């Protein structure tokens, strides 16, 4: 098992892709801590992990709060005795894209704070523990929205997810000498939770248009999203850092 004896922390781990990643880590031997801002999601996520026989703990944490993040990370690292993997999957958008004049400063702050600052706070809290352990792996979450000019992503989200790429590369350079690797994943549209409902509500024409924008002409399975994250987090990618892995069916090539 790729993560036997490893301790992993997953933000946004209460549901959707974050929970699926936590389950993947756990099934391959990791003890897992999930952080999520939604108390019900943390409770449900822990129940799911425990039912699968995975050693797990959870905390209700808003990643925009650096003190809360640090306290939760320190607690998880202390409980496991070390911390080896961070999956910074927490993020968010304004939902339906808005024109520039309809985006308030508060709207912009919300998206930047959750995505960029949240990722920064989590990395800042985890790196000291990884240094103490002699190394580690961090996987950040960009998006097709940070890699293309897709009109469905919105300006704040596109800016935030592009910023994640810069954060990833610069952090990778800084912590590389400590044996810590930092890589980004850039998923496209994957159908879990809210996104599944949005896709199902589209007309047949609109769904076909979405699929036509993807060179592979189909949506991914949840496993096709989880497996690349596990690859980047594992020693299978031990000589890869500062990279971005597109998991969007080639959609990033469309511009």
Predicted segments with their positions:
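The beta1-alpha1 cofactor-binding region of Rossmann-like NAD(H)/NADP(H)-dependent oxidoreductases
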Residues: 39-40, 60-72, 105, 223-224
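Short C-terminal tail/terminal secondary-structure segment
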Residues: 97, 230, 241-255
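Alpha-helical segment proximal to the catalytic Tyr-Lys
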Residues: 128, 173-177, 238
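Residue(s) in the substrate-gating loop at a strand-loop-helix junction
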Residues: 143
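Active-site helix of classical SDR
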Residues: 123, 160, 168
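Canonical Rossmann dinucleotide-binding motif of NAD(H)/NADP(H)-dependent dehydrogenases/reductases
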Residues: 2-33, 171
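Substrate-binding pocket helix/loop in short-chain dehydrogenase/reductase
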Residues: 97-100, 104-112, 206, 210
């Amino acid at each position: 098992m790729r993560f036997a004896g490893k301790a992993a922390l997953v933000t946004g781990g209460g549901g959707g892709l974050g929970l699926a990643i936590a389950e993947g880590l756990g099934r391959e031997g990791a003890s897992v801590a999930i952080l999520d801002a939604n108390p019900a999601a943390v409770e449900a996520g822990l129940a799911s992990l425990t039912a699968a026989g995975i050693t797990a703990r959870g905390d209700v944490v808003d990643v925009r709060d650096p003190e809360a993040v640090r306290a939760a990370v320190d607690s998880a690292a202390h409980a496991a005795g070390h911390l080896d993997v961070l999956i910074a999957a927490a993020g968010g958008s304004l939902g339906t894209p808005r024109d520039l004049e309809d985006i308030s400063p508060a709207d912009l702050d919300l998206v930047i704070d959750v995505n960029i600052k949240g990722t920064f706070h989590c990395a800042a809290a985890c790196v000291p523990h990884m240094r103490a352990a002699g190394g580690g792996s961090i996987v950040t979450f960009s998006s097709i929205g940070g890699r293309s000019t897709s009109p469905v992503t919105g300006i704040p989200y596109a800016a935030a997810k592009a910023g994640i790429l810069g954060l990833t590369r610069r952090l990778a350079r800084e912590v590389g000498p400590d044996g810590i690797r930092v890589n980004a994943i850039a998923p496209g549209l994957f159908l879990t939770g809210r996104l599944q409902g949005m896709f199902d509500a589209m007309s047949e024409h609109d769904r076909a248009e979405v699929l036509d924008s993807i060179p592979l002409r189909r949506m991914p399975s949840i496993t096709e999203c989880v497996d690349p994250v596990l690859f980047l987090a594992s020693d299978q990618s031990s000589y890869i850092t500062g990279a971005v892995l597109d998991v969007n069916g080639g959609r990033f090539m469309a511009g």
